[in-house]
Amino acid sequence: MKTKRLMKFVMAAACGAIMAGAVHAETAEVTLARQFGIGYLPLTVMNVNGLVQKHLKQSGLNDTKVTWSRFGSGSAANDALLSGKLDFAAGGTGPAIILWDKTRNNAKVHGVAALSSMPNLLVSAAPEIKSLKDFTDKDKIAMAGAGSSVQTVYLQMAVAKEWGMDNYKKMNPHMVNLPHPEGLNAMLSGATGIRSTFTTPPFQYIALEKPGVHVVLNSYDVMGGANTFLMVWATDKFRTENPTTFKAVLGALNEATEWINANPRKAAELYVKDTGGKDSVEEIEKMIRDPQIHYTLAPERILPYAQFMNDVGTIKNRPQAWSDLFFPEIHDLKGS
């Protein structure tokens, strides 16, 4: 998705900063989060291709150190963000919306931009489990950030449709908190009693290549179509105190996103190299080209997702528009 107006805004701000000179000192180091999976591909491209450094230098910030940190879940990134150890968190929409709600009167966390929309699949290696109704008390579901993750909310929304809003937590006792790679391995090994996992690309596609593994639930079916799975968020304090750095990171994210959409093969090669070469370039390229997978800064169907969280009491504040959840820099995009 082209975002020319956004880039004009970012570049104008960068040029203004250079012309005005160092109006005030900005942070000497910017720290960004990474996680596992191709949903985070824009961040991987930013890291490998040095795009944050590029946009910082274009903005006149030549000496800012760029540090990347990996986290196993969005909730872990939230802890680091609030403690001041992280400037830009990344993860599922669930943890981001929860922090937006909790920090309305202090840190004022908002979304910077969406990262990707992609279906999340609840898959199972148990032949008798074909729907949510087939889970017994002994059947466990591995998922990253269980209890607060995006997969948690997808599952709760599906449960509410099946058994009513009053029972939306019916499946919570089945959740086991494991990062996506470990959750996949646990299900495939069968040694831990975990026979299902609610996960993301590429892990769900790897799982489906194994005999007997099948889809139980698709998040797009729950949401009625494509919706934002991953996003980037930050505190208002960081944005206010470091406006040039903030816009440089957003500009880098936009460049990475447009590069992926224009160069899916090169993006697949970059991802495979960065992750150690275990995945097939052809398979990763196929995922990137999948019409169900969108790399875009514009949020998709995030409002009904957040409003469900308010309906069940997960968050206290109810957003009236998708833009309530994000900083103004992307308000001109066609979000939903």
Where are the regions a protein language model picked out?
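Bacterial N-terminal signal peptides that target proteins for export
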Residues: 1-11
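Pocket-lining segment of extracytoplasmic ligand-binding domains
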Residues: 104, 176, 181-272
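Short, surface-exposed acidic
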Residues: 15, 61-66, 166-173, 275-287, ...
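Solvent-exposed, polar/charged alpha-helical surfaces in well-ordered, non-transmembrane soluble domains
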Residues: 50, 54, 75, 79, ...
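Secondary-structure end/capping motifs
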Residues: 239-316
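Conserved C-terminal helix/tail region of periplasmic/extracytoplasmic solute-binding proteins
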Residues: 309-336
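Short, glycine-/small- and polar/acidic-enriched structural segments
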Residues: 26-168, 174-177, 195-201, 225-226
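Sec/Tat signal peptide C-region and signal peptidase I cleavage site
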Residues: 20-25
